[in-house]
């Protein structure tokens, strides 16, 4: 470290905000949040993410377009270059943890070049009362957004990269201003490590009621994980990343990373109230009075708020609870043919978990050509799961079977027609569906079967118009509905051909005509 460079260790959020303002890294909003702009990368860069290929990962990773291999020697050389760059400038260090279960946490030393990225890290990771009390081997995360990679020299895809090295327990982020890369990289680390310990890592939100009734909400970004788990009547565990171990569900993080597009106090009061001093607002436009305009998408559809769980009044302080009674798969159906809620058998749960059918809504990935497009994302989070999909599906079924959890498919997308002509289910309707699920009011109820979709739908849900429950009722053109439903069933069938699973699971999905 040069004589003029300063290393700031374990600063408070207030101290970091002072540094961020002094360094010109962003602006303080009227509500007290710190607003930062991430430049041309306003989402994750999947083509720039790599995992170092070495003996411990060579035969365990599902290598391909998602998990791209990186040379170990190239990693060492680039890490050394970036580390030297960091040491020559002021930087920030904190001692944090990932995983709220004392049996399954990882200690992480986070080093960042900027103060605002450090606030993000302290918000999103766990700030323990006593760091690494079990003396677990620690990880290092180094985030240096102003470092410019040289692809020919460094072996990267572009001027920025995210590299995960399991053998050395290191994560390198260079040239990446989008802060979400930090949290997702450590999520990927836990997603690789936890299954070996018999723990299912999940891309889901979680909350728990007064009676200890835990509920999980799986889904891609924009499908409702954060909104639906932020329920004023229940205690929040977390909004995005969890582990399901025998006897417990625990948060992998210590904060929330909420989408801000069209955020309103009326529809999302918990999130609204959490955005205050200490919160990071990412790519949010301010008006002339520095009031956030959450309807302004001129920078991106993927504007975000990162805040610590302490900003949520009604939360589970321990960041963990018991095993779930209800498991909800959130799908945003752009074809408009899926019902608002379906009750899944164990086999159907496996089918839909592996399929991960949904839409990219205001995609979190850069380079998305459309703000809404359908997709199949294995385990409702394919970009973050390094092992083969079957590993996670088998663990899910094991947990569901052993604990007797009920599984539901909830459509937060369109009905009455596809995106563009149909109408999206409003938040109050989806909340009523979720309320019925978490309160146990859909257990053992009368259902009707939708043949082409192979789904069982309740004939009545408290607080929901019964005409909405069977989607054919919401379409004026019934023949057009049948056409779209058959097309979706065929898409499911085609997508599922890549999975080598039992006939019971294969036959639990939609039936291509």
Swiss-Prot record:
Annotated residues for binding of ATP: 184, 203, 219-227, 268, 304, 430
Record's subcellular location: Cytoplasm
Gene Ontology MF term list: ATP binding; metal ion binding; phosphoenolpyruvate carboxykinase (ATP) activity
Manner of cofactor binding, per the entry note: Binds 1 Mn(2+) ion per subunit.
EC number: 4.1.1.49
HAMAP family assigned: PEPCK_ATP
Protein name per UniProt: Phosphoenolpyruvate carboxykinase (ATP)
Native source species: Pseudoalteromonas translucida (strain TAC 125)
